[in-house]
Amino acid sequence: PEHEEYYRDQNLSESLKAIYDHRCQVCGMNFKIKYDEPFAETHHINPLSQGGADISKNIIVICPNHHRIIHKTNAEFDCTKLLYRYPNGYEERLVLADHFEQKSSWG
């Protein structure tokens, strides 16, 4: 299958990582503290490939482990409860959600 490219705003991604100091919004893991190296990824809640927007309200900062398991299991995000629901019924609430609660219109 052909791989389609989607525009991603790297400044937005880096800004969100800075807000959370590179901590995973799901588990709070901070590689910078443990390994002296900032290491986090950003994940689109609604995938760009399915019409999701590259805006702050559609992006979370996440550790590589959570990024992989969310994709592998196709976990669903509950926007009202700010949690991921996995196919086996397990639910994991975001421990960090500052940018969802801001009344800002950036991104």
Which sequence ranges carry the predicted segments?
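Conserved hydrophobic/aromatic pocket- or pore-lining residues that grip, position, or stack substrates
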Residues: L16, C24, H67
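Short, well-ordered alpha-helical segments in soluble proteins
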Residues: Y20-R23, F31
